[in-house]
Regions:
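Conserved HGGG/HGGXW glycine-rich cap/lid loop of the alpha/beta-hydrolase fold
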Residues: 1-33
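Gly/Ala-rich beta-loop-alpha elbow adjacent to hydrolase catalytic centers
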Residues: 61-69
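Flexible "cap/lid" loop of the alpha/beta hydrolase fold
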Residues: 70-75, 80-110
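Catalytic histidine-centered segment of alpha/beta-hydrolase-like enzymes
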Residues: 178-187
Length: 195
């Protein structure tokens, strides 16, 4: 899921798909409990969860979840059977993250409750992501990749299309009349694409 979401954000999409009984929805906030709110710590926890699986895995992530999934597929190409990246970035847009963090500073603490994060943790996490750039490592991804982006997701559509160009064995699908949170805005349409 994305930073402003939780695993329940996927319920409507999952209900519409034939998801494996062994599928798991991870909570990003729970993965950081008791740890520093940094991308490195979050990725370490995410990797640990993925490493628990004995067989190849299919990873599906939106926004921050897509960044984590892509990072894992780069580091463990033999472990990832397929990837679904929704509203994905492979090189963090520094200016956009700066603006986002400025807005986070202005928002009340209560606005962060549904995320499961404290305001300071969200600001810290976003700050540590500014330098992420997987451009030189994309060639390591060896599995099939479905890249999905909403038609109205101006911040991610261009990059998602670029990512499709850079990854071998990838396919881009644009969800019409949909913005950034495809799993919330168009769960039925997303479920069809995921089948």
């Amino acid at each position: 899921h994305g930073l402003g979401q939780n695993p329940d954000s996927w319920n409507r999409t999952i209900k519409e798909t034939k998801v494996s009984e062994s599928s798991v929805g991870l909570s990003l906030s729970e993965m950081l409990e008791g740890k520093s709110a940094t991308y490195k710590e979050l990725y370490s926890s995410f990797s640990g969860e993925c490493d628990k699986e004995n067989e190849e895995i299919v990873l599906c992530g939106l926004s921050l979840g897509a960044v984590l999934a892509l990072n894992y597929a780069i580091d463990h190409p033999d472990k990832v059977k397929a990837l679904v990246l929704i509203a994905a970035q492979y090189k963090m847009p520094k200016k956009l993250l700066e603006v986002q963090n400025m807005l986070f500073h202005l928002m009340p603490n209560s606005a962060f409750n549904k995320m499961g994060f404290k305001k300071a943790d969200v600001i810290s996490l976003c700050g540590t992501m500014a330098e992420l750039d997987f451009s030189d490592s994309l060639h390591k991804v060896s599995c099939p990749v479905l890249i999905v982006c909403g038609e109205k997701d101006k911040a991610n559509k261009k990059t998602s299309k670029e990512l499709c160009h850079y990854l071998n064995n990838s396919y881009f699908h644009e969800l019409m009349k949909t913005g950034h949170e495809a799993n919330i805005e168009a769960p039925e349409e997303l479920a069809i694409v995921l089948q």
